[in-house]
């Protein structure tokens, strides 16, 4: 595309309160974000009623980072056409709202309703409320806790999982208001550290990934008798008839998935029948949760630290040791399964988490001490870089559509 002085543009937005007339404009091709922002504010009359509104702009679903002309040349957009420019309000960067101090590194975090659980290298799980008060500190593991996950929570009790370098997963039951949580089942079967756990959509089963190179499938159902549940998923006859409650009974896996050749670093339940795993063997694998068959393998070039799946866009995101975040579409029929690469981190990308309400929004955590929030339509520039941590960030999760949680080796969980 040759350089042009003027372009025809039409503005539109999906935010009804900021709609303007559907009228084409003839604009200089050399204007960028700032001039467009002034133009939209002028058309809305916002500049006359206090502080102007900040907007972002997209052309063909890609963020405008430069002038209109440079964007059109890069994307090979014809100068003869009317350029459709979408604008949307730019929200201010999230700010730290609270800091929850731990005794050791914070490896993992999970939120359910108004309660947060964290896993730490002090071998403990802690339960917190939204205001940052510690409701319970749960001991039991003999090595650092690597992952935590809520199973369920109601007015009376909460059930959650914790996995550890001690090779076990504990199914815990918390009596709300008592400050106490008891271990109902200890899940044993892995022979090395259990680094990742994920619950299925119906909260009846969960999977685990370990440094022993395997995934295992387990029952997440808490037996009232506290009895041992094994491969057949049933209680012993004696336990059924006597009704004797036995705490912390051993639970064995329902199934073992083999195929990874190095440590399994991350597992996620994609839907009712599909589990996804990633590992240090540079592979992402999709498994049939019923049969244990490895349905598909996606190959990368570096160690995978964590994967996340979005039901909104049906895509996977991966964080890797090469500092990059990759977006994967396992359904791609053209063979191009990598749909995008997000570049900005300066260290290992240790954790990734999709927004629960926005199919384009992704959070990432890195050993470079930062948390970043991305719109996947802007692969080279994150929306925000959050710099509250003083050391490596090990985990990040959305607690709601507009709130984040991150934990790291500075012994802090930061709520944004």
Curated annotation (Swiss-Prot):
Gene3D superfamilies assigned: YVTN repeat-like/Quinoprotein amine dehydrogenase
WD repeat copies, ranges: 101-138, 140-184, 189-228, 259-297, 299-338, 344-384, 388-416
InterPro entries reported for this sequence: G-protein_beta_WD-40_rep, NLE, WD40/YVTN_repeat-like_dom_sf, WD40_repeat_CS, WD40_repeat_dom_sf, WD40_rpt, WDR12/Ytm1
BP-aspect Gene Ontology terms: rRNA processing
CDD domains named in the record: WD40
One cellular component (GO) term of this entry: nucleoplasm
Keywords, in A-Z order: Nucleus, Repeat, Ribosome biogenesis, rRNA processing, WD repeat
Subcellular localization, as worded in the UniProt entry: Nucleus, Nucleolus; Nucleus, Nucleoplasm
Keyword Membrane: no
Keyword Nucleus belongs to the record: yes
Region entry Disordered, spans: 226-245
Chain intervals for the UniProt region annotation (Ubiquitin-like (UBL) domain): 7-89
Protein family membership: Belongs to the WD repeat WDR12/YTM1 family.
Task performed by this protein: Required for maturation of ribosomal RNAs and formation of the large ribosomal subunit.
Protein name per Swiss-Prot or TrEMBL: Ribosome biogenesis protein WDR12 homolog
Organism field: Nematostella vectensis (Starlet sea anemone)
Origin organism lineage: Eukaryota, Metazoa, Cnidaria, Anthozoa, Hexacorallia
